[in-house]
């Protein structure tokens, strides 16, 4: 009989490499609410059901129409006349037996009228193709409850996403091109001792050629310090001189030529990395200085408790530095030397994490919580990623839509270029205005397209006037949006479905950094942009 754990590892192999067991566990404990099972909505859920989201609930009061069947792969003609939430749930559940699917045959407006607390239970609410008025109502309820809200929309060849979350903390941000944490400029005692155990001047050739480049750089730094008042090589000229010092250390053969020592070549190549000063990034420093980090209460999340614990470590045992990360890059070296060096860093990281753990324990006790409420594993992970912590704070929809608090500067500066994706945002706001006035979107009926162009132009002008925006929207965009007729082409819905599911997974797992706060995709020009609105 197959071990269920092994079978799960095989099933989710690729994604486990991305976000690990703990990320998968967060996904499997999540309950996502989708409002409206349109083409975009079912595409988003498909991309959450396949990786194994714990549960989903679809809220949709609409019946399946011929139009739905025409653009939605998850609805068949036999479903016409049935409730759309029910029909989509049945087919989506077939994708993954591990996932629990539920549906509510009611409009979000009715739920907001009768039981707005219904939405409090979810890990994330995703609203698709929702009218502006409902979106604002639901946004206010979720903002108050602290539930993350993702608004998605496909409008013709335009894709739109808006993330609304008061505070989202990220421990594992997985940054690209992260610098190694080697501490060669400020070596800790055990590293110093380990480096000193290597005598490069009196070594067999084989050992000399298989000494890790970190050791090579550290030993030659000592020589550099002796000649340069213990100052690190800082500028290009000094670093080039240091590289030359390393080149001179390469062994010579009996003919006086240089031996082929790849470890020294690695050392020369990695001079910039190795000599990067050990310091705390401004982003991490901002987190340490935040009020939430300063004032820990029994309501504080584990992120802020651990941030305070790391800050205490920095101010005391760390002598101004973060806990050692504990990892080193692959390099040319024999296994024994590499493992010994790796263990020096790893052991130091574990000792630092243990000290942070003590700070966290004392902190938890001071606010009346048990030390077990944050596990050792969580603290180790936090210490390992302390240099890459992120906090994302989005503005509320109410602030974005209010004439007093909307982001005028962002809109105006972007509209200096009349074909900026910002014009798509203004057009989406304008078609919503059209809907409020006419209870339909422009161009939905072919015979009204010409007439709707003028009506939509009035809506664009009234929007710009109301918000005192002195910008120009080309007539081409007004014509284009009328031609869209609020259609939801599957190609755009599929792209949006993949993008939105990716952001949803970031929110649920607290890994990778979500966008802040508005994303626009233009399928005509194959471009996209992110704005803070």
Swiss-Prot record:
Q: Where is this site: Interaction with uba3?
A: 210
What GO terms in the biological process aspect are recorded for it?
protein neddylation
Disulfide bond annotation, renumbered to this chain:
none
Instruction: Copy the pathway line from the protein's UniProt record.
Output: Protein modification; protein neddylation
Region Interaction with uba3: which residues? 330-343
Q: Does the keyword Transmembrane helix apply?
A: no
Pfam families hit by this protein: ThiF
Regions crossing the membrane: none
GO: which molecular function terms? NEDD8 activating enzyme activity
Keywords (A to Z) from UniProt: Ubl conjugation pathway
Q: What does this protein do?
A: Regulatory subunit of the dimeric uba3-nae1 E1 enzyme. E1 activates nedd8 by first adenylating its C-terminal glycine residue with ATP, thereafter linking this residue to the side chain of the catalytic cysteine, yielding a nedd8-uba3 thioester and free AMP. E1 finally transfers nedd8 to the catalytic cysteine of ube2m. The covalent attachment of nedd8 to target proteins is known as 'neddylation' and the process is involved in the regulation of cell growth, viability and development.
Q: How does it assemble?
A: Heterodimer of uba3 and nae1. The complex binds nedd8 and ube2m.
Q: Which family does it belong to?
A: Belongs to the ubiquitin-activating E1 family. ULA1 subfamily.
Q: What protein name does the entry list?
A: NEDD8-activating enzyme E1 regulatory subunit
Which gene is annotated as encoding this protein in its UniProt record?
nae1
């Amino acid at each position: 009989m197959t071990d269920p754990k092994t079978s799960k590892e095989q099933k989710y192999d690729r994604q486990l490499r991305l976000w690990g067991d703990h990320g998968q566990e967060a996904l499997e404990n999540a309950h996502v609410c989708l409002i409206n099972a349109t083409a975009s909505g079912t595409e988003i859920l498909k991309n959450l059901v396949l990786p194994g989201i714990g549960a989903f609930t679809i809220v949709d009061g609409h019946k399946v129409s011929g139009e739905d069947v025409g653009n939605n792969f998850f609805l068949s003609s036999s479903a016409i006349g049935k409730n759309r939430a029910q029909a989509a749930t049945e087919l989506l559940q077939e994708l993954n037996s591990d996932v629990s699917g539920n549906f509510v045959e009611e409009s979000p407006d009715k739920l907001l009228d009768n039981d707005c607390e219904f939405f409090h239970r979810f890990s994330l609410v995703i609203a698709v193709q929702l009218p502006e008025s409902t979106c604002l109502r639901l946004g206010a309820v979720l903002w108050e409850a602290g539930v993350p809200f993702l608004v998605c929309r496909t409008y013709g060849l335009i894709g739109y996403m808006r993330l609304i979350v008061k505070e989202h903390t990220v421990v594992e941000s997985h940054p690209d091109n992260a610098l190694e944490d080697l501490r060669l400029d400020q070596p800790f005692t055990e590293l110093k001792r380990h480096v000193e155990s290597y005598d490069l001047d009196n070594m067999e050739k084989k050992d000399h050629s298989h000494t890790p480049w970190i050791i090579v750089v550290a030993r030659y730094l000592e020589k550099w310090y002796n000649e340069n008042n213990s100052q690190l090589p800082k500028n290009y000229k000094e670093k080039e001189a240091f590289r030359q010092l390393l080149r001179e250390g390469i062994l010579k053969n009996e003919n006086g030529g240089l031996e082929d020592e790849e470890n020294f070549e690695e050392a020369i190549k990695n001079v910039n990395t190795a000599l990067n000063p050990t310091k705390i990034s401004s982003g991490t420093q901002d987190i340490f200085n935040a009020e939430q980090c300063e004032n820990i209460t029994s309501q504080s999340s584990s992120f802020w408790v651990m941030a305070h614990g790391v800050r205490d470590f920095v101010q005391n045992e760390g002598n101004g530095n973060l806990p050692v990360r504990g990892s080193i890059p692959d390099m040319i070296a024999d296994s024994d030397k590499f493992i010994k060096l790796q263990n020096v860093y790893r052991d130091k990281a574990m000792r630092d994490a243990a000290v942070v753990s003590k700070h966290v324990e004392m902190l938890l006790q001071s606010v009346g919580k048990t030390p077990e409420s944050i596990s050792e594993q969580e603290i180790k992970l936090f210490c390992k990623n302390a240099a890459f912590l992120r906090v994302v704070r989005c503005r509320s929809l109410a602030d974005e839509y209010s004439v007093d608090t909307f982001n005028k500067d962002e809109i105006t500066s972007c509209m200096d270029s009349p074909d900026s994706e910002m014009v798509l945002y203004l057009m989406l706001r304008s078609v919503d205005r059209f809907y409020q006035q006419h209870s339909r979107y422009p161009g939905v009926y072919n015979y009204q397209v010409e007439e709707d162009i003028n009506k939509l132009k009035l809506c664009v002008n009234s929007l710009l006037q109301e918000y005192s925006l002195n910008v120009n929207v080309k007539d081409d965009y007004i014509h284009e949006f009328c031609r869209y007729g609020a259609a939801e082409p599957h190609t755009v819905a599929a792209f949006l479905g993949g993008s939105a599911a990716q952001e949803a997974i970031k929110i649920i797992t607290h890994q990778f950094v979500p966008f802040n706060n508005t994303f626009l995709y233009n399928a005509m020009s194959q471009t996209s942009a992110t704005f803070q609105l």
